[in-house]
């Protein structure tokens, strides 16, 4: 807070007009270290605003010396004439620059306190991310060679690997994603070695409960997956048993049984035969046939 108040009341009196963007850079580095601003191009634009003055980077707010310039060295390119001196209203110009990038952190006491709170939160996220990066490196380093390729593929699916080289400003979401990555990488470690490996990891204290919950959930999913695989194998074995080719004796016995079953069905359950009318067959009788006639 003292540094902010000092900067608000600061004026730069020098023959060399230091870029106000360097003052902005000091605040940005304090509040958001990961934010990358091209100070050099901003400095060149300020050279157009202050013609006749050499714009150089400011080393610090206290020394007021450019980078690489010894305090005892004299700048021959700058005249010692007092008329060449310029007073830059740093507080006003710094505020204008901050407003131009959508930031009004120096506008009030509450905003200054909010900037400090943001700085503390940012430092906490940076520390958490750093520890989780270490944990990821430890896990991958201890995996067998055959599993390192799978671990790399998992890492590339979950996050942009360019962020490992040039990390952006951290967020809560990014940190939680890293916790998820650590949990997934642990699934590649044999269960009997997980406990010892977890003890060597750098898990932030504030995230240990979440990490343990993620790890338990991953273990449950792993057990469920193994159970499903085991049930699938059992079903396959059962199907193979039913499809075995019977022996000759079994085939003969089954054939006889099927024949008896068909015969039984034909006798008992088949359609009943409809009785047909018997045809009278004429028989020849020798001699004259008697006539059965009754006379009245």
From Swiss-Prot:
Q: Which GO terms fall under biological process for this protein?
A: 2-micrometer plasmid partitioning; protein stabilization
The protein's organism comes out as Saccharomyces cerevisiae (strain ATCC 204508 / S288c)
The modified positions for N-acetylmethionine read: 1
Misc. comment: The plasmid 2-micron circle is a extrachromosomal element that resides in the nucleus and propagates itself stably in host cell populations. It provides no obvious advantage to the host but imposes no significant disadvantage either at its steady-state copy number of 40-60 molecules/cell.
MF terms (GO), sorted A to Z: identical protein binding
What the protein does comes down to: Part of the plasmid partitioning system, which ensures the equal distribution of replicated plasmid molecules to daughter cells. The plasmids exist as well-organized plasmid foci within the nucleus that stay together throughout the cell-cycle and act as entity during segregation, effetively reducing copy number to one. Plasmid partitioning requires the proteins REP1, REP2, and a cis-acting locus STB (REP3).
Instruction: List localization entries.
Output: Nucleus
Residues covered by region (Nuclear localization): 276-296
Ranges where the record places region Disordered: 228-296
User: Where are the residues of the annotated region Interaction with REP1?
Assistant: 1-57
Q: What is this protein called?
A: Partitioning protein REP2
Q: Which UniProt key words apply to this protein?
A: Acetylation, Nucleus, Plasmid, Plasmid partition
């Amino acid at each position: 807070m003292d540094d902010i108040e000092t900067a608000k009341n600061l004026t730069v009196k020098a023959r060399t007009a230091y870029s106000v963007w360097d003052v902005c850079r000091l605040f940005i580095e304090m509040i958001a270290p990961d934010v990358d601003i091209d100070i050099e191009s901003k400095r060149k634009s300020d050279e157009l605003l202050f013609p006749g003055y050499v714009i150089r980077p400011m080393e610090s707010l206290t020394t007021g010396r450019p980078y690489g310039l010894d305090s005892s060295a004299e700048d021959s390119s700058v005249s010692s004439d007092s008329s060449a001196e310029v007073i830059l209203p740093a507080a006003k110009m710094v505020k204008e620059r901050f407003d131009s990038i959508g930031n009004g952190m120096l506008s009030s006491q509450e905003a200054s306190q909010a900037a400090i709170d943001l700085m503390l939160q940012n430092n906490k996220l940076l520390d958490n991310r750093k520890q989780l990066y270490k944990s990821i490196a430890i896990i991958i380093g201890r995996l067998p060679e055959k599993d390192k390729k799978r671990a790399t593929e998992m890492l590339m699916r979950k996050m942009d690997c360019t962020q490992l080289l040039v990390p952006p400003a951290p967020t809560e979401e990014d940190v939680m994603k890293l916790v998820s990555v650590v949990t997934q990488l642990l699934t590649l470690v044999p269960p009997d070695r997980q406990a010892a490996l977890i003890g060597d990891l750098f898990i932030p204290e504030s995230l240990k409960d979440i990490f343990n919950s993620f790890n338990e959930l991953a273990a449950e999913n792993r057990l469920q997956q193994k159970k499903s695989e085991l049930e699938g194998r059992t079903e396959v074995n059962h199907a193979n048993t039913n499809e075995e080719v019977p022996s000759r004796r079994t085939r003969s016995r089954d054939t006889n049984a099927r024949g008896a079953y068909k015969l039984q069905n034909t006798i008992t359950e088949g359609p009943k035969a409809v009785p047909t009318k018997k045809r009278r067959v004429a028989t020849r009788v020798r001699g004259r046939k008697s006539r059965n006639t009754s006379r009245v």
